[in-house]
Amino acid sequence: MTLRTLQAGVAVSIALDRVCFFCYNGAVAHCVVEAAEDILDRRFSVLDKGFVRLIDYLGGDARIVQAARVSYGAGTRTARDDAALIDFLLRNKHTSPFEQVVLTFHVRAPIFVARQWMRHRTARISEVSSRYSLLSHDCYVPQETSVAVQSTRNKQGRASEGISPEQQQEVRAAFEAQQKAACAAYDALIQKNIARELARINVPLSLYTEWYWQIDLHNLFHFLRLRASAHAQAEIRAYAEVIIEITRAVAPCATASFENHEKDGVQFSGREFAALKALLAGEGLSLEGKERARFEEKLRSGLQQ
């Protein structure tokens, strides 16, 4: 990582591996992260026809550290101190320093993924407009192994077990036939000079769309905590996992702390914490009913319930 400045002053640098901090008169200016520079504008494929690209970024781990220390003017210390500070900030929910880091992505995903994505309103979004542009015929078709029946436990998800290969092939063929018919109907309306804003209204949710997405690191971590969860739909989870790796290139210490405390962590209620202490003391479990079932499932699966 390299910190650059346009200010005049005496430079002091502390080099640790690939990390180099330059402090001018106690201030840190523009932050250039080598690992992030290496992947700028690179396409990371997701699903069958989608991708994510990192278009731009502002700041990294060093920016978080400097934002946290600005109140008392302390300069940058060592990489170990910085990682410890970032970890302290994240686990104690000091969010403002993380909002100093901003990432901009170019995303291509099916419309149904985009609609889940855009429920996260603390971001800036610019999506391709089908009122101005002609739509492509690119539609998402799930892999055969992704085709499953409705879950009996999760009202908004599919079952973990699949169906027979013959049924999976039949469902995929039905998807493709419906998509082809919908796109042909769209083309027919366009050829009749029907307004694009009307011709588009029956296109399938599987059609791919594109958008630019700019978000600060604090709100990005919130997005990833929800969308990289095992509870999220598999398709948007695939995008979230790619974005985690891109984010790691920009802010590796912050991403590691996020994974440890939020993505892979579990929260306990007051009564659950009391029950956990009782178990550690060799006492019985006082929780009952659904509360007990949720608590035991947290301990078993490591997933938030």
Swiss-Prot record:
EC number: 2.1.1.148
Molecular functions per Gene Ontology: flavin adenine dinucleotide binding; NADPH binding; thymidylate synthase (FAD) activity; thymidylate synthase activity
Catalytic activity line of the entry: dUMP + (6R)-5,10-methylene-5,6,7,8-tetrahydrofolate + NADPH + H(+) = dTMP + (6S)-5,6,7,8-tetrahydrofolate + NADP(+)
This protein's encoding gene: thyX
UniProt GO BP: dTMP biosynthetic process; dTTP biosynthetic process; methylation
SUPFAM superfamilies named among the record's database cross-references: Thymidylate synthase-complementing protein Thy1
Protein name (Swiss-Prot/TrEMBL): Flavin-dependent thymidylate synthase
Purpose: Catalyzes the reductive methylation of 2'-deoxyuridine-5'-monophosphate (dUMP) to 2'-deoxythymidine-5'-monophosphate (dTMP) while utilizing 5,10-methylenetetrahydrofolate (mTHF) as the methyl donor, and NADPH and FADH(2) as the reductant.
Subunit annotation: Homotetramer.
Domain ThyX: 50-261
Cofactor names: FAD
Annotated residues for binding of dUMP: Q116, W117, M118, R119, E127, V128, S129, S130, R131, R200, R227
Keywords: FAD, Flavoprotein, Methyltransferase, NADP, Nucleotide biosynthesis, Transferase
HAMAP family listed in its UniProt record: ThyX
Record-linked InterPro entries: Thymidylate_synthase_ThyX, Thymidylate_synthase_ThyX_sf
Annotated PANTHER family: FLAVIN-DEPENDENT THYMIDYLATE SYNTHASE
Annotated motif ThyX motif, positions: 119-129
Binding residues for FAD: S96, R119, H120, R121, E127, D216, L217, H218, H222
